[in-house]
């Protein structure tokens, strides 16, 4: 049984380690693999997905691989047009009726074939992933990435019932999408609520906690694989996420994990959440920060080391490798 799975169920002898966006532009090998392919073509190429996913374990020696895909892949199931130019560009109107595919195995065949290939080649667990409902709704309503989500917030305030209905539809589709990934061979699930920091605290429970609770409940009725929830938020809202039913909670770098372990009687399995900007430092300085960060967390029995957001494109590969080496040398016994 792998370290990643162990930390969610039994104890591990050291903190398992993997990273958000652990494969990406910071890797010369990834840039060579992608070559001149467009991002959309790359994300729909079974062989490319397979080889890119394998770069994480092979180059970093991490304890888990996360499927190399994009959160917008879910939109294939709605037949919504999107592209990367270079950022996400989505053609969607809130007036459109969302109808999800009745043949997900065919719609996502490029992805499911990659998962089946990977399971044969990996010696670590493969993590399936998808966006949580609020984050996917933000992409749809903004037509792509956004800093302040003005269209989303305006729609949310003007049409709260319609926004609730949109979140419900997205959650139901995400259950189908992730269930197919698990049935193809993935052994764990990572949910990404990466747009949630924009919400006022008073709206967090309605638009983040409740939809994720519904999503996780439906997932647990369909699959037995462990579920981790990544969420961008502050400490006060993070505590609210304990009611979602996620097996592991993964805050971004705004949350002080050490304080969570102190404040919560039964903190359960936590994952994260070192600031990815620290990886940009000269290696000796970075490792000093890492040792301080781990001084308390490494002793927590259900702790998984990870980044508090995706690894940045400017990151030296050697620093990520050094972080893994530091983690794998830890003994908590």
Curated annotation (Swiss-Prot):
Q: PROSITE patterns recorded for this chain? A: UROD_1, UROD_2
Q: Which residues bind substrate?
A: 21-25, 70, 139, 194, 309
Q: In which pathway does it act?
A: Porphyrin-containing compound metabolism; protoporphyrin-IX biosynthesis; coproporphyrinogen-III from 5-aminolevulinate: step 4/4
Q: Name one GO cellular component term.
A: cytosol
- The answer, when asked if Lyase is one of the entry's keywords, is yes
Q: For site (Transition state stabilizer), what residue positions does UniProt give?
A: 70
- Some GO term, biological process aspect, for this entry: which one? protoporphyrinogen IX biosynthetic process
Cytoplasm listed as a keyword: yes
Catalytic activity as recorded in UniProt: uroporphyrinogen III + 4 H(+) = coproporphyrinogen III + 4 CO2
User: Which key words are in the record?
Assistant: Cytoplasm, Decarboxylase, Lyase, Porphyrin biosynthesis
**Main localisation, per the record?**
cytoplasm
Function of this protein?
Catalyzes the decarboxylation of four acetate groups of uroporphyrinogen-III to yield coproporphyrinogen-III.
Q: Which family does it belong to?
A: Belongs to the uroporphyrinogen decarboxylase family.
**Subunit description:** Homodimer.
PANTHER family with a match to the protein in the record: METHYLTETRAHYDROFOLATE:HOMOCYSTEINE METHYLTRANSFERASE RELATED (PTHR21091), UROPORPHYRINOGEN DECARBOXYLASE (PTHR21091:SF169)
What protein is this chain from?
Answer: Uroporphyrinogen decarboxylase
Gene source species = Chlamydia abortus (strain DSM 27085 / S26/3) (Chlamydophila abortus)
Which gene name belongs to this protein? hemE
